[in-house]
């Protein structure tokens, strides 16, 4: 990978501003940053939230961690430096979506506080951290992709929660507890926050 920075570039201002797009869409651009262990319910809740918001007439886009590794991040592995670059790229993409006035939902384990804080710095007021709280015992029991078993057997290295750490959010804007609340209640809690903060 060529790490040389671009030179001789100038930011191009456009005639249509973010506020124009938000006015047309009747919504505020935002980034709902879902974080939690594998199997905690990030994708499940995010997908249900996107569907609910769509039914309510809002424009959304879901950036899924696995899906982006098929394209944009296909050159990255799961070592610490790759995870950091993964989150950096996603943050930049999410920033573009928010600027377009879109409610952007990201579902990434994003295990490191520093990486999430860097995303928060880049995205500013658009960043809404959504902690999908679920004990590892429950996640491992669910194991929808069969990867906890592989990690326990040593077939997968650097697996979050097993041989790589997950750093819980310190002050997330939203916490949903998927191990005791229904999918519907989790979605309703997030929507209530979005309404209270005039994103919807």
UniProtKB/Swiss-Prot annotation:
Residues binding ATP, per UniProt:
36-43
Q: List the disulfide bonds.
A: none
A Pfam family matched by this chain, by name? APS_kinase
Q: Which reaction does it catalyse?
A: adenosine 5'-phosphosulfate + ATP = 3'-phosphoadenylyl sulfate + ADP + H(+)
- Gene Ontology biological-process entries: hydrogen sulfide biosynthetic process; sulfate assimilation
Annotated metabolic or biological route of this protein: Sulfur metabolism; hydrogen sulfide biosynthesis; sulfite from sulfate: step 2/3
Which GO molecular-function terms appear in the entry?
adenylylsulfate kinase activity; ATP binding
Enzyme Commission number(s) of this protein: 2.7.1.25
Q: Keyword set for this entry?
A: ATP-binding, Kinase, Nucleotide-binding, Phosphoprotein, Transferase
Does the record's keyword annotation contain Transferase? yes
Q: Which residues form the active site?
A: 110
Note the superkingdom of the native organism: Bacteria
InterPro entries referenced in this protein's UniProt entry, alphabetically: APS_kinase, P-loop_NTPase
Gene3D superfamilies documented for this protein = P-loop containing nucleotide triphosphate hydrolases
User: Which family, according to the similarity comment?
Assistant: Belongs to the APS kinase family.
What functional role does this protein have?
Catalyzes the synthesis of activated sulfate.
Question: What HAMAP family does this protein's entry cite?
Answer: Adenylyl_sulf_kinase
Which NCBIfam families is this protein grouped with?
Answer: apsK (TIGR00455), PRK03846.1 (NF003013), PRK05541.1 (NF004041)
Protein name (Swiss-Prot/TrEMBL) = Adenylyl-sulfate kinase
